Amino acid sequence: MLRALLPPLAAGLALTALPAQTATAASTLTNGGFEADGSGAATPSGWSEYGATGASYTESGGRSGSHRLSHWSSSAYKVETYQYLSGLANGDYRLTAWVRSGGGQNAAYLALKNCGGTEQRTDLPVSAGDWIRIVVPVRVTNNQCTISVNSDANAGNWLNVDDLTFTPGTSGLAVKGADISSLPKSEAKGGVYRTASGSAGDGVALLRSAGMNYARLKVWVNPADGYNNKARVLAMAQRVKAQGMKLLVDFHYSDTWADPGKQHKPAAWAGHSYSQLKADVYQHTYDVLGALKAQGTTADMVQVGNEINGGMLWNEGSTSNWTQLAGLLNSGYDAVKAVAPSTTVALHLAEGGDLGGTRWWFDNAVSRGVRFDAIGLSYYGYWHGTLHDFQTTLDDAAARYGKPVFLAETAYPFRLDSEDGLENIIDLTGELVPGYPATTAGQTRWMNDVASIVEAVPNGRGLGVFYWEATWTARTGNGWDPADPASGNGWENQALFGYDDRALPAMSWFSHR
């Protein structure tokens, strides 16, 4: 634990509930960096406390200054550190704070309340070592607001908060989506999708009712099983749009999976020259998107390639030949805009916690004139670094390239055991992200916390989040290998429907503001 040792004063304070300590109201946030009193202040200047007040105090080890606010006690505790603001002009405001937490609390969150409307909260992500920036937006309608830091904690649980600001502005996610490419084949193999109470329903409609507003569909050129091709995407697009959702089309430019480890050309393009491949990319992209537009389901966003860290259409489009890769990417971009100029074109990399790799890739792309509108990153916490790494990379990409950014893929397990005959990809406790157990609560917390990090991207450039393969439940014949009907899934413990086919609590993240 990186929490500094308790100063003698704080260590000796009683941890029983005391009468609320109330500071004088002001119209601007006071002492948001907790520097006014030094270490050991039980009631920081400008702030008030309620509950086990001895568990709330300032100590050394601030993020940008010398001190921070901490909550901690050797026994279970509930405490609120708050500041009341009055005389505010009505309008939209945003609380920004840097936080750390060892996790384990029953609740640990920042809140804006008594502002004239519904209380707004953001939970603290689990991050024991590095500071994470989070935001809480609110609309003030009664000229006042209370800023609140809350802990409902077990013995030894701790949090740190520092560098709070309360400024005009707002935040939220435009994209609350999921990849549901697996759904048609699952349904064909007998897959059933149910509400949390057990009523069977349409998988797309169930996700929409939970708050999902964007669907991601991958498209392969000529897959062995006949799924995820143009015809299947067209059919799914009609279902998506009928539910009032937007559509992202994810071009793999392959007959099968394309990712950092493999970017195989479609069999029909195997012998083509580089100039032919540029034409292939344009024609395939235009063909699929044109057909979508013709049936009234125009794509709202398009990925030109999937997890293209090493390029696409190997070897001609490898990053070992950036000039050729740039030409292929621009062919895709041109095709998208020829069909619908308003469609957003995104470039998508894996390893969302790799700041250096992301900079290297996009610096090369920009220097060669690659055109794009948005940046998508995959981030799986059990593979791609800490939440701090992800936030640093996401923030940097948005600022460095001046583009909106989004989380193109993430997921988390709600259990570790397998429902089919194939060992799950994540099936050991040691593979999990600390503070996020493989439970329905752990899965829910993961999604809310990564959504909060995307929401906190400065200047409103955090577009949103796509959950990867929400509907990929275990069904015989719907495994990883499109050429092998006997292949297993390996992902059913990270779907958003449980082994009883019921909607899981993690779907609540679709209602993230």
At which residue positions do the language-model features occur?
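Extracellular beta-strand ligand-recognition surfaces/modules
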Residues: 34, 135-164
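Beta-strand acidic-aromatic groove motif in beta-rich domains, primarily in extracellular
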Residues: 42-46, 79-81, 103-114, 145-149
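Aromatic-rich peripheral "rim/lid" segments of glycoside hydrolase catalytic domains that contact
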Residues: 188-192, 392, 396, 415-449, ...
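Glycoside hydrolase catalytic-domain groove-lining segments
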Residues: 203-204, 338-344, 357-433, 440-444, ...
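Extracellular glycan-recognition surfaces and repeat-rich motifs
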Residues: 27, 33-76, 202
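Active-site cleft segment of glycoside hydrolase catalytic domains centered on the general acid/base Glu
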Residues: 229-234, 259-372, 385-394, 400, ...
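Extracellular carbohydrate recognition and processing domains
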Residues: 115-144
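Extra-cytoplasmic beta-strand recognition segments
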Residues: 34, 79-105, 134-138, 163-164, ...
